[in-house]
C-alpha cells in the first residue's frame, strides 16, 4: 500500500457571522484556497488531479449542486477534474482528507484536493413544499445550524437537543464545572493571541480580497472571531444559553462562522512526478457513533478507536487538535483520554472557541494548523479530532515527514 502525503494546505481567514466575509458567496469562498494551491504549486499538471473532495454541512444555499465540483471550476481547475461534496456535518472536511488519503493508499488516485467550506452567514431560510392542497404544514426553516425538517421518529427515539443543549448534557454527565469551562475558553483565546502575535498563522492563511463600491478593495487576512482581551471575570458574568443557571455560554462555545480550507494530497509517485515536497503523511482515520444528545463526547471513542487501529497511544501525540465546539465537551473528551485540562499539546495555538467553527471547513483547518505546528516544533505525530452533530466523532492522525 502506498503512502498518502500532504504536500500543501491553506485556508481563508475565518470570519464572524455577518462579518468581513458575509458578502462572499459560499461557492466563491470555497474556490479561494483551491486557487491558492494552484498558484503555490506551479509544477503540478492540474489536469492530473483525480478528484476534489470538499466538505460542506449545509448545501441549501449557494453551496447547493455539489459545491466541491463548483469550487474546482471556479478556482480554475481544468473541466476534466471532477469534484464531490461530503457531508458529515462538523466532520465533513476531516472526512474529506481521510477519504482522499484512503483513495491514494488504495492506488485508485494519485493526486486529490481535499478540504471544505461553510458560509454560515449566508445559510438561507428554506421552506418545504406543502404535503397537500391548501395545507398549512409548510414552514420556514433556518439552515444556519442544527435541526430542521425534523423527523418525528427521530424526535421520539433520540430527542432533538440543540447543540448547546447537548453540551449541557455532556457537562452534567461528565461533571464539567462552569469555572473549568471558562478557564478552557480563556486558554483558547490566549493561545490564539500568542500564536497570532508570533505570526504563526501567516503561512496557512490566504488573504481574501473583497471589492468595495468605492475605494480600494478590502483585504481580510486575519481570523475575525477571536476575542483576545476577554477576561475570566467577563466570562463569569455571561448567562447560560440553554438556561439562566446553565454552564454553557456564548463565551465558552465556538462561533458561527465563515471560511474555507484546502489541502493537496499526493502519492509518492505523484510527489516525484510533479516535484512536490511531502510535509506529512496520513496514517489513518476512524469514526464512531454515540447518542445524539451527548454528541460532543464523540472525539473520545473515535480517537481511541483510531489509536488502537494504529497501535499507538495518546502519549505519542506531539500535537492534539481537538475542535472546541464547546469547552464542556472539550474537557470531557480530554479528561477521558487521560489528559490534563491545560495540556500544552492540546490546541497549542488556540481552538474553535477563539478561531471559530465554520462547520464544513473546520476539520481541514485542524489538519492544516497541526501540520504547521509539527513543522515549527519538530514534532512527529498529530491527532485531529472532532465531535459531530447527531451523535458521531471523527479522528485522524498525521505524521510529519
Located regions from the model:
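Conserved catalytic cysteine-centered active-site region
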Residues: 24, 56-111, 141-147, 157-163, ...
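Conserved active-site "lid/cap" helical segment
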Residues: 1-71, 75, 82, 166-178, ...
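Condensing-enzyme catalytic core mediating Claisen C-C bond formation in acyl metabolism
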Residues: 1-24, 145, 150, 231-297, ...
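Active-site pocket-lining segment
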Residues: 54, 168, 201, 212, ...
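Active-site-proximal alpha-helical scaffold in enzymes
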Residues: 86-118, 171-200, 262-269, 334-335, ...
Amino acid at each position: 500500500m502506498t503512502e498518502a502525503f500532504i504536500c500543501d494546505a491553506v485556508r481563508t481567514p475565518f470570519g464572524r457571522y455577518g462579518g468581513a466575509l458575509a458578502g462572499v458567496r459560499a461557492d466563491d469562498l470555497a474556490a479561494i484556497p483551491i486557487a491558492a494551491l494552484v498558484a503555490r504549486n506551479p509544477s503540478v499538471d492540474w489536469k492530473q488531479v483525480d478528484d476534489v473532495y470538499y466538505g460542506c454541512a449545509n448545501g441549501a444555499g449557494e453551496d447547493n449542486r455539489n459545491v466541491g465540483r463548483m469550487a474546482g471550476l471556479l478556482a480554475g481547475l481544468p473541466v476534466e477534474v471532477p469534484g464531490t461534496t461530503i457531508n458529515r456535518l462538523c466532520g465533513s472536511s476531516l472526512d474529506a482528507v481521510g477519504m482522499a488519503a484512503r483513495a491514494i493508499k488504495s492506488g485508485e488516485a494519485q493526486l486529490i484536493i481535499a478540504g471544505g467550506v461553510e458560509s454560515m452567514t449566508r445559510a438561507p431560510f428554506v421552506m418545504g413544499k406543502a404535503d397537500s392542497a391548501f395545507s398549512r404544514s409548510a414552514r420556514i426553516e433556518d439552515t444556519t445550524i442544527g435541526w430542521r425538517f425534523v423527523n418525528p421518529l427521530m424526535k421520539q427515539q433520540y430527542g432533538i437537543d440543540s447543540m448547546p443543549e447537548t453540551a449541557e448534557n455532556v457537562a452534567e454527565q461528565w461533571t464539567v464545572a462552569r469555572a473549568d469551562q471558562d478557564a478552557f475558553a480563556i486558554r483558547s483565546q490566549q493561545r490564539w493571541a500568542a500564536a497570532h502575535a508570533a505570526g504563526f498563522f501567516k503561512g496557512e492563511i490566504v488573504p481574501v480580497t473583497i471589492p468595495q463600491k468605492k475605494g480600494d478593495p478590502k483585504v481580510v487576512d486575519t481570523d475575525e472571531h477571536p476575542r483576545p482581551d476577554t477576561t475570566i471575570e467577563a466570562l463569569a458574568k455571561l448567562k447560560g444559553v440553554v438556561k439562566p443557571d446553565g454552564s454553557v455560554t456564548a463565551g465558552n462555545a465556538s462561533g458561527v462562522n465563515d471560511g474555507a480550507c484546502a489541502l493537496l494530497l499526493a502519492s509518492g509517485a505523484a510527489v516525484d512526478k510533479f516535484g512536490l515536497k511531502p510535509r506529512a503523511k496520513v496514517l489513518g482515520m476512524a469514526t464512531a457513533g454515540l447518542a445524539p444528545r451527548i454528541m460532543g463526547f464523540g472525539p473520545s471513542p473515535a480517537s481511541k478507536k483510531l489509536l488502537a487501529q494504529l497501535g499507538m497511544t495518546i502519549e505519542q501525540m506531539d500535537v492534539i487538535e481537538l475542535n472546541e465546539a464547546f469547552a464542556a465537551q472539550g474537557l470531557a473528551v480530554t479528561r477521558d483520554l487521560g489528559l490534563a485540562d491545560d495540556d500544552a499539546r492540546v490546541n497549542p495555538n488556540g481552538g474553535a472557541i477563539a478561531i471559530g467553527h465554520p462547520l464544513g471547513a473546520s476539520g481541514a483547518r485542524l489538519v492544516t494548523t497541526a501540520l504547521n505546528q509539527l513543522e515549527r516544533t519538530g514534532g512527529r505525530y498529530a491527532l485531529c479530532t472532532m465531535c459531530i452533530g447527531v451523535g458521531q466523532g471523527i479522528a485522524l492522525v498525521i505524521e510529519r515527514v
